[in-house]
From Swiss-Prot:
S-adenosyl-L-methionine binds at residues 200, 223, 243-244, 257. Keywords: Methyltransferase, S-adenosyl-L-methionine, Transferase. SUPFAM superfamilies: S-adenosyl-L-methionine-dependent methyltransferases, Winged helix' DNA-binding domain. CDD domains: AdoMet_MTases. The active site is at 261 (proton acceptor). Its EC number is 2.1.1.240. One of its GO terms (molecular function) is resveratrol 3,5-O-dimethyltransferase activity. It catalyses: trans-resveratrol + 2 S-adenosyl-L-methionine = pterostilbene + 2 S-adenosyl-L-homocysteine + 2 H(+). It comes from Vitis vinifera. This is Trans-resveratrol di-O-methyltransferase. Belongs to the class I-like SAM-binding methyltransferase superfamily. Cation-independent O-methyltransferase family. COMT subfamily. Catalyzes the biosynthesis of pterostilbene from resveratrol. Pterostilbene has both antifungal and pharmacological properties. Also has activity toward resveratrol monomethyl ether (RME). Induction: Expression in leaves is induced by different stresses, such as downy mildew (P.viticola) infection, ultraviolet light, and AlCl(3) treatment.
Length: 357
C-alpha cells in the first residue's frame, strides 16, 4: 500500500487510526480495573451528587504526585461510558462526575455488582495466556492456558486457592445478576417442577435464589469436591460433590448455566446424555434448562455481536469449548437423544433454552 498506487492520504490515515485503536484497546480494560481498585465508583456513589475533580482527588488513595493525572484517567472512563459529566448546580458551569448504568454494576456492596468478574478476568493469571495465542496455534496443546501454565485451567484452579476463590466469586457475581432477571422474566420455566439439579453450580448462588423463590422445589448443586467443600445447604437446598461426566443425581429438571460453552461438542454430548439419564420423560415433566449464548448472525448491534465474539475467543483461550449458533446447539441436542427445544431470548447476550427428551 502506498500513495502511488491510488490510496489517498485520508484512507491511509484512517487505516492507521484503526490499527492504532486496536493496539491500545486494552487501555480501556486496564483503566476500568484501575478505577475499581481505587474505589472510584463507590466514592462517587457515596458522595450523593455530582462530584468535582478536586473533591474526588481529595478522597482517592493516590500519591500527591499523581493527583494531576487523575483527570486523564477520568477522561477515558467518561469516554468509555463508565462515568458521565453533569453540572454540579443549575446555572453554573462547573461539572462533576456521576455514575452510569454500567458503573453502578461495579459498586462493591451492590447485590448485582459484577466487580469480581472484572477483577478476575483482568488478573495477570488470566491475561497471561493471551500472550501465548500464536504459540498455541503452532503446537498441539489443548488450550493457550495450557501452553502458558502446562496444565488445564480446571487443574490450575483446583490447586491454586487464589484463582479458585476469585473465579468462583466472579461466577457468583454473574449468577446474582442473571438470576434476578431470570426470576423476574422467566419464572414460568420452573412451573410444575418438584426437583432441580444445578450442574456445575459453583457455590450455589443460582440454586439458592431459585430455592428461596420456590420453597416447594428441592434444589441440588452438583460440582467438584474442591468447589462445594464446606458449603452448607438449607431446607430445600443441598450440595453434592461429583463429576457431571460420570453421573448426575435424578431430578425433574437439570440446570446448565454457562456450562456447555466450556466444552467441546463431544464432551457436551456426553454431559447432555448424563442429563437425559437423570430426568423423566417429557410427559412427566422432564427437561434440561440451559442458559448460554446463541451466536447472532447479523441480527444484533455491532457491540453485542463483538461481545459474543470476545466470549468465543475467551473460551478458546481457557477451555476446549466455544460459543455456538442455533444450528450447532440443535445438533448437540439431537446427538444426545433429545427430541426438541425452545429458545426464550430474555437474558441479554444469553438465552434461556429448554430441551426436552
Amino acid at each position: 500500500m502506498d500513495l502511488a498506487n491510488g490510496v489517498i492520504s485520508a484512507e491511509l490515515l484512517h487505516a492507521q487510526a484503526h490499527v492504532w485503536n486496536h493496539i491500545f484497546n486494552f487501555i480501556k480494560s486496564m483503566s476500568l480495573k484501575c478505577a475499581i481498585q481505587l474505589g472510584i465508583p463507590d466514592i462517587i456513589h457515596n458522595h450523593g451528587k455530582p462530584m468535582t475533580l478536586p473533591e474526588l482527588v481529595a478522597k482517592l488513595p493516590v500519591h500527591p504526585k499523581r493527583s494531576q493525572c487523575v483527570y486523564r484517567l477520568m477522561r477515558i472512563l467518561v469516554h468509555s461510558g463508565f462515568l458521565a459529566a453533569q453540572r454540579v448546580q443549575q446555572g453554573k458551569e462547573e461539572e462533576g462526575y456521576v455514575l452510569t448504568d454500567a458503573s453502578r454494576l461495579l459498586l462493591m456492596d451492590d447485590s448485582l455488582s459484577i466487580r469480581p468478574l472484572v477483577l478476575a478476568m483482568l488478573d495477570p493469571i488470566l491475561t497471561k495466556p493471551w500472550h501465548y495465542l500464536s504459540a498455541w496455534f503452532q503446537n498441539d496443546d489443548p488450550t493457550p492456558f495450557h501452553t502458558a501454565y502446562e496444565r488445564s485451567f480446571w487443574d490450575y484452579a483446583g490447586h491454586e486457592p487464589q484463582l479458585n476463590n476469585s473465579f468462583n466469586e466472579a461466577m457468583a457475581s454473574d449468577a446474582r445478576l442473571l438470576t434476578s432477571v431470570l426470576l423476574k422474566e422467566g419464572q414460568g420455566v420452573f412451573a410444575g417442577l418438584n426437583s432441580l439439579v444445578d450442574v456445575g453450580g459453583g457455590t450455589g448462588k443460582v440454586a439458592k435464589a431459585i430455592a428461596n423463590a420456590f420453597p416447594h422445589l428441592n434444589c441440588t448443586v452438583l460440582d467438584l469436591s474442591h468447589v462445594v467443600a464446606g458449603l452448607q445447604g438449607s431446607k430445600n437446598l443441598n450440595y453434592f460433590a461429583g463429576d457431571m461426566f460420570e453421573a448426575i443425581p435424578p431430578a425433574d429438571a437439570i440446570l446448565l448455566k454457562w456450562i456447555l460453552h466450556d466444552w467441546s461438542n463431544e464432551e457436551c454430548v456426553k454431559i447432555l446424555k448424563r442429563c437425559r439419564e437423570a430426568i423423566p420423560s417429557k410427559e412427566n415433566g422432564g427437561k434440561v434448562i440451559i442458559i448460554d449464548m446463541i451466536m447472532m448472525k447479523n441480527q444484533g448491534d455491532y457491540k453485542s455481536t463483538e461481545t459474543q465474539l470476545f466470549f468465543d475467543m475467551t473460551m478458546m483461550i481457557f477451555a476446549p469449548g466455544r460459543e455456538r449458533d442455533e444450528n450447532e446447539w440443535e445438533k448437540l441436542f439431537l446427538d444426545a437423544g433429545f427430541s426438541h427445544y425452545k429458545i426464550t431470548p430474555i437474558l441479554g447476550l444469553r438465552s434461556l433454552i429448554e430441551v426436552y427428551p
